[in-house]
Amino acid sequence: PPPAHVVAKLAEVAAKPDAHGYSASKGIPGLRKAQAAYYQRRFGVELDPESEVIVTLGSKEGLANLAQAITAPGDVVLAPNPSYPIHSFGFIIAGAAIRSIPAAPGPDFFERLRLAMRY
């Protein structure tokens, strides 16, 4: 078992109401500043860490946030099928209609994609 002082500290922190939940939805400010500085050094791109940089808990959250940012209710979004659920559901939650593109092995996917974009 862990030492008693470790268990006591864990219980103390767990009892605090502000110790539960996720970080701020934009992410930790210092991390956002570091990301903006990296893009400046690496790519020569200036980003405002307060309005142009976010930190997500993973790619699914990032895709859902992207869908909310770029989709208006009624938009039609093309999504491969099969795919991970978030590829469609993030856009569905944002009010989009999903047009599935069958993603079978072989070179036909891009032709099916071109056809789907016509409608």
Where does each model-flagged region fall?
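N-terminal small-domain helix-loop-helix segment of the aminotransferase-like
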Residues: P1-G58, N65
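PLP-dependent aminotransferase-like
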Residues: A8, E12, P49, Q68-Y119
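Hydrophobic alpha-helical packing elements
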Residues: L31, G62, F109-R112
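Sequence-pattern detector for short linear motifs
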Residues: Q35, L63, L115-M117
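A conditional alpha-helix N-cap/helix-loop micro-motif detector
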Residues: T56-K60, G106-F109
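Short, hydrophobic alpha-helical packing/hinge segments within bilobed ligand-binding/sensory domains
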Residues: G62-L63, H87
